[in-house]
């Protein structure tokens, strides 16, 4: 049997990838499932299944149809998970399915362990372990809590990356807007008022006549936005120009100027 050290080293290999490449939650679930011989789920705070793994023969039809098909746990059950503020080991379902009240469980002697995923003093999700026939040992719980720490670090990293990306996109839009002259800014406001959503067809001459500016002002404004990577434009000849917004912060920043 593998020692605790051997099992921890397997998990460490995943942790060592963090920062170089994104950690896939399914990878953590797979390794933990292999070393503990149990079903493993990584669940977000809102109940979404971020990763899971089942050993052979440990998949029941209810889980497959209700959980895996939607990749989400029922809200009522997820609320129970979130109410666990520390590790709750070896919870028995007493032969009753926890997802279908009163229905007998397909698998006998099921025990569940709930491990909260916490990072930066915030509840980020839950690591759920389900075993059949054998209770989790203290060694298993150590590995479970260690894995929850790895997952928590990765969720925090993903959140930080998302915040940084949002700030970058916002800064790019602000710089692009800053390069426009007053007349070009006026033209841009009318252009995106004409668009239906994130993309659409623009006839520059119609907007020029409507606003009372030259067509060249519109063309220059679009070129500046395109060179900044904020939009993508494609000429369709006499039909006009097809415009697609690439940066989802553009419309929000234009609204602030009005």
From Swiss-Prot:
Subcellular compartments: Cytoplasm
Major subcellular location class: cytoplasm
GO molecular function, one term: GTP binding
Entry keywords, A to Z: Cytoplasm, DNA-binding, Repressor, Transcription, Transcription regulation
Positions of region (GAF domain): 1-156
GO terms of biological process kind: negative regulation of DNA-templated transcription
SUPFAM superfamilies named among the record's database cross-references: Winged helix' DNA-binding domain
InterPro entries xref list: CodY, GAF-like_dom_sf, GTP_trans_reg_CodY_C, Transc_reg_CodY_N, WH-like_DNA-bd_sf, WH_DNA-bd_sf
Superkingdom of origin organism: Bacteria
One GO cellular component term: cytoplasm
Disulfide bonds: none
DNA-binding region extent: 204-223
Function of the molecule: DNA-binding global transcriptional regulator which is involved in the adaptive response to starvation and acts by directly or indirectly controlling the expression of numerous genes in response to nutrient availability. During rapid exponential growth, CodY is highly active and represses genes whose products allow adaptation to nutrient depletion.
PANTHER family: GLOBAL TRANSCRIPTIONAL REGULATOR CODY, GTP-SENSING TRANSCRIPTIONAL PLEIOTROPIC REPRESSOR CODY
Protein family (similarity comment): Belongs to the CodY family.
Name of this chain's protein: Global transcriptional regulator CodY
